UniProtKB/Swiss-Prot annotation:
Keywords: Acetylation, Cell projection, Chaperone, Cilium biogenesis/degradation, Phosphoprotein, Sensory transduction, Vision. The keyword Amino-acid biosynthesis does not apply. Forms a complex with the beta and gamma subunits of the GTP-binding protein, transducin. Interacts with the CCT chaperonin complex. This is Phosducin-like protein. Residues 17-60 are annotated as: Disordered. The modification Phosphoserine is found at residues 20, 25, 226, 293, 296. The keyword DNA repair does not apply. Residues 158-301 are annotated as: Thioredoxin fold. The gene is Pdcl. Residues 36-299 form the Phosducin domain. InterPro entries: Phosducin, Phosducin-like_reg, Phosducin_N_dom_sf, Phosducin_thioredoxin-like_dom, Thioredoxin-like_sf. Disruption phenotype: Conditional deletion in photoreceptor cells leads to 50-fold decrease in Gbeta-Ggamma dimer formation and more than 10-fold decrease in light sensitivity. A 20-fold reduction in Gbeta5 and RGS9-1 expression is also observed, causing a 15-fold delay in the shutoff of light responses.
Length: 301
């Protein structure tokens, strides 16, 4: 049983503050703080939080960030490579088509220069060895024949000898014909030496020179004198654009009484009074193209 003094003393002891006890308590708290490791509040804080961003800056988070970075870098590099391949393929196709077009244009230009006579066959073959000579010659013949055909059909075609019935017909034939037409008039009379030969030559030349108009007229029809008939026949008059450009009287003095078409043709060609003969030109082009060798530098006109 406690006394009043014990109670009083005991109550004082309960409320008594001791500095030694506080110091012991502080030491225990410090010891507990040193021994207990720091524990993360939540496990999620150590993981990556969305889009590869790590909240934790520890070793594990750094490694994950590095792996994610390398993955993105690899994907970007692969995409760049694919884009580069697509670009290279596109450029190569466009460049190839452009080069093919330029090559074809150059071939056509070289061919045109050759046809125009500016380049020999040897130069052409050296410049473009891939083009076959036979192919070139075929193209050349085709174009030359087309040019000759156009020239051949450009003017009127006659192909025969026309008989002039009167003096008025003689004047109309000279004045009313096209200015580009060459007209050859044989003035004749039956029984005059060389008349038959001249008539035969005119018929032959009319077929070989269809663009030239060959005519004949009796000297009596145009009112020629008997003296002219005796001394000047057979006569050959040549007109163009209404003008007399050739006048040959008594042709037998140059060709004799018996002559042929080739003789009369050569005689007229000496004076430049016959145009280029289309049939012979086409034949010469064919023969020259067939016999032309690869190493020859002969130009075909």
């Amino acid at each position: 049983m406690t006394t009043l003094d014990d109670k009083l003393l005991g109550e004082k002891l309960q409320y008594y503050y001791s500095t030694s006890e506080d110091e012991d308590s502080d030491h225990e708290d410090k010891d507990r703080g040193r021994g207990a490791p720091a524990i993360s509040s939540t496990p999620a804080e150590a993981e990556l939080a969305g889009e590869g961003i790590s909240i934790n800056t520890g070793p594990k988070g750094v490694i994950n960030d590095w792996r994610r970075f390398k993955q993105l870098e690899t994907e970007q590099r692969e995409e760049q490579c694919r884009e580069m391949e697509r670009l290279i393929k596109k450029l190569s196709m466009s460049c190839r088509s452009h080069l093919d077009e330029e090559e074809e244009q150059q071939k056509q230009k070289d061919l045109q220069e050759k046809i125009s006579g500016k380049m020999t066959l040897k130069e052409f073959g050296t410049k473009d060895k891939n083009l076959d000579d036979e192919e070139f010659l075929q193209q050349y013949r085709k174009q030359r024949m087309e040019e000759m055909r156009q020239q051949f059909h450009k003017g009127p075609q006659f192909k025969q000898v026309f008989e002039i019935p009167s003096g008025e017909g003689f004047l109309d034939m000279i004045d009313k014909e096209q200015k580009s037409t060459l007209i050859m008039v044989h003035i004749y009379e039956d029984g005059v030496p060389g008349t038959e030969a001249m008539n035969g030559c005119m018929i032959c030349l009319a077929t070989e020179y269809p663009a030239v108009k060959f005519c004949r007229v009796r000297s009596s029809v145009i009112g020629a004198s008997s003296r002219f008939t005796r001394n000047a026949l057979p006569a050959l008059l040549i007109y163009k654009a209404g003008e007399l450009i050739g006048n040959f009287v008594r042709v037998t003095d140059q060709l004799g009484e018996d002559f042929f078409a080739v003789d009369l043709e050569a005689f007229l060609q000496e004076f430049g009074l016959l145009p280029e003969k289309e049939v012979l030109v086409l034949t010469s082009v064919r023969n020259s193209a067939t016999c032309h060798s690869e190493d020859s530098d002969l130009e075909i006109d």
